[in-house]
């Protein structure tokens, strides 16, 4: 017998829900209904009375996304970074999920890479066997070994924002948060198109900003993924799809970084510490300041520090 959960909410939330489920709307609406939507393992029906019914195996998980919105009092409340209606259901770790993660945002040298990966629930034991976990806990050699196997196991989409383009977009008023949002959305969109007609049970983004801010960044985009999209900090510990995305993003970043070092004709350090300032100063001396945008993220404080070292 399938689960059935009813929540009481308001017209604003129902309109938001209709927007979220717009790609899953059913042409049929029951009497007194506003809309009916069908997502994997759950049917959602919203009524003019303000009641919303969730039916199916994932009724509880789907309803939990909206209960906090409906029950929050109008007085301002301070929410934790993970407290929002896009929080993943408790069972997400065993679901078939698209996960996305980015690498390179804190490195002065090198590009920003974003990868989206689809992991079918049946593949989870295999990924564990391959040693898939957060890339921050793996060295470059381990990343390479695991990534080379992953490339043949999971569907993925990989994007690289090279330094020159990064600096150009940043100069046009796009902060790093917006650039990350654009890349995550694009990688996920590309992967979903590649996977079609297979649909994941959900999409999990390794959270780098509040979901509402994420969607504001995407306001002018033609294609924005909203259906069953969840956000969680430390996403790699929530689902292996994010951990796999983290590894492939790191693998891509390391490859690009090595190519950049060859182009520079000198080893380039990662991160944004003092050794980076010294290396940047040497690079300016070697190639000239006009070549710097090819290698670095110019808005970092390291740029000014490198020029100071040359005085």
Swiss-Prot record:
GO terms for cellular component: cytoplasm; ribonuclease H2 complex. A divalent metal cation binds at residues 101-102, 206. The keyword Coiled coil does not apply. Its main location: cytoplasm. GO terms for biological process: DNA replication, removal of RNA primer; mismatch repair. One of its GO terms (molecular function) is RNA binding. InterPro entries: RNase_HII/HIII (IPR001352), RNase_HII/HIII_dom (IPR024567), RNase_HIII (IPR004641), RNase_HIII_N (IPR024568), RNaseH-like_sf (IPR012337), RNaseH_sf (IPR036397), TBP_dom_sf (IPR012295). It catalyses: Endonucleolytic cleavage to 5'-phosphomonoester. It is found in: Cytoplasm. Residues 95-311 form the RNase H type-2 domain. CDD domains: RNase_HII_bacteria_HIII_like, RNAse_HIII_N. Its EC number is 3.1.26.4. Keywords: Cytoplasm, Endonuclease, Hydrolase, Magnesium, Metal-binding, Nuclease. NCBIfam families: rnhC. Endonuclease that specifically degrades the RNA of RNA-DNA hybrids. PANTHER family: RIBONUCLEASE, RIBONUCLEASE H2 SUBUNIT A. HAMAP family: RNase_HIII. This is Ribonuclease HIII. It comes from Bacillus cereus (strain AH187).
């Amino acid at each position: 017998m399938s689960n059935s959960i009813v929540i009481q909410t308001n017209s604003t939330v129902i309109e938001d829900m209709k927007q979220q489920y717009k790609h899953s709307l059913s042409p049929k609406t029951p009497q007194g209904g506003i809309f009916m939507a069908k997502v994997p393992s759950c049917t959602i029906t919203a009524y003019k009375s303000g009641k919303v019914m969730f039916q199916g195996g994932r009724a509880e998980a789907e309803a939990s996304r909206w209960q906090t919105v409906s029950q929050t009092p109008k007085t301002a409340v301070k929410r934790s970074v993970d407290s929002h209606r896009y929080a993943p259901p408790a069972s997400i770790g065993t679901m078939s999920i698209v996960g996305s993660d980015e690498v390179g945002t804190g490195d002065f040298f090198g590009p920003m890479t974003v990868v989206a990966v689809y992991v079918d629930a049946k593949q989870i034991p295999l990924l564990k066997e391959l040693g898939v976990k957060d890339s921050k806990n793996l060295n470059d050699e381990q990343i390479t070994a695991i990534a080379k196997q992953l490339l043949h196991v999971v569907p993925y989409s990989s994007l690289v924002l090279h330094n020159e383009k990064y600096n150009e977009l940043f100069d046009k008023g796009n902060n790093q948060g917006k650039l990350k949002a654009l890349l995550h959305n694009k990688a996920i969109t590309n992967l979903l198109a590649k996977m079609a007609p297979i649909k994941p049970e959900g999409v999990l983004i390794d959270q780098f900003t509040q979901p509402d801010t994420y969607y504001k960044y995407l306001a002018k985009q033609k294609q924005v993924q909203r259906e069953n999209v969840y956000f969680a900090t430390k996403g790699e510990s929530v689902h292996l799809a994010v951990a796999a995305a983290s590894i492939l993003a790191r693998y891509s970043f390391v490859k690009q970084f090595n190519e950049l070092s060859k182009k520079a004709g000198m080893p380039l350090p990662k991160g944004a510490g003092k050794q980076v300032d010294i290396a940047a100063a040497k690079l300016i001396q070697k190639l000239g300041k006009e070549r710097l945008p090819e290698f670095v993220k110019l808005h970092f404080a390291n740029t000014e520090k490198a020029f100071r070292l040359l005085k």
